Amino acid sequence: MTQPTNEEILHVCDRFDLCGRVIKVKPCGDGHINYTYIVTTRRDDCDCRCRYTVQIVNTDIFKKPDEVMENIVHVTEHIRAGLRRNGEDTERGTLRVVYTKDGKYSYTDGEGRYWRVYRFVEDTVCRQTVDSPATFARVGEAFGDFQRRLSDFDASLLYESIPNFHNTQKRYADFLSAVERDAAGRAHGVQEEIRFITDRAEKCSLIVDALASGELPLRVTHNDTKLSNILLDETTDEAVCIIDLDTVMPGSALYDFGDSIRTGAASAAEDEPDLDKVHFLPEMFKAYAEGFIKGTGGALTEREVRMLPDGGYIITLEQAIRFLGDYLDGDTYYHTKYPEHNLVRARTQLKLVADMEACMPELREFVDGLI
């Protein structure tokens, strides 16, 4: 994916139905996944200014970008309709896709780059770190509210933008294949870690089977539930809307809950080499669970609430499986900074899994009390 020139960006902007002419283009972010620009326009007849988020979607990661955009349009329009019914802010409460002048939600340029545009959400900020249980509870409430607003949307209408993303059963099968291949000749040095995972093989089908049987309902899932994907009001610090919707797809609410717990209820970074510093933090789990359930406003089933601890456990185990599998394959998927990086990552996740197992009775008792 090549970075565009300023002239190319202006050409693309002219294809979209923007208000006024472009007067400023500012790069935003590090371009790790998508190239992003903040574009300012001005209407000459009234000197009104508007801002837009203009992006190139990384089609190396998202192979079917039209499906990604259809998902985003479905979800944001559903949320906006609910905001409108309730008399809430339809401009800031969810992302607004800007269409091209010929009525499409994207534009592909001569270089094959796939462009999209959102209205910029004004007077908001992003924060990167969770510094307290209270902050984590607010993150939980925001993502719980996302579930609530989409609880009456038919998730089966969405495409699976990354197939089998949280199919832990398949992730485990892929891991066993990596062990058998031993492509990098590393399996002999990680037998303890391999055994830890294989001893928990039956756990991998827990959520997948519950979805298949109907024990858990199919829901819209965000799949990247971190603080930086919540826009906060710059004055009140209250959550305004959820962003980064590229991985929105059908799944279980436990996936989103578990993804937050895996990182937010850990005492250290996922690549902390000193395992004595790595602990699961029950108080952070409890804070997030309270916020999440409050945000859902009763949209979760009793079974979903009771299985919230399983969400944190399974997603953490799944990530350990992925890290260790990539280590065995010779680090072909995750970017690494040193030869043992993926192994270090896997070990932190396995330490969290072990800690969660020890805390599981306490966690189950806590969520049962929230029903």
Where are each of the predicted segments found?
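Secondary-structure capping and boundary motifs in well-ordered enzyme cores
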Residues: 110, 135, 217-222, 249, ...
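Conserved ATP-binding subdomain of kinase catalytic cores across diverse folds
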Residues: 25-28, 32-44, 49-52, 56-177, ...
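Helix-rich C-terminal or lid/interface subdomains of diverse kinases
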Residues: 170, 286-368
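ATP-dependent phospho-/nucleotidyl transfer catalytic cores
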Residues: 26-30, 55-56, 62-66, 124-137, ...
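Amphipathic alpha-helical segments that form well-ordered structural scaffolds
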Residues: 11-12, 78, 145, 196-203, ...
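Active-site Asp-x-Gly
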Residues: 63, 232-297, 336-342
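Juxta-kinase regulatory segment immediately upstream of eukaryotic protein kinase catalytic domains
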Residues: 1-26
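Short, surface-exposed acidic
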Residues: 18-24, 186, 299-308
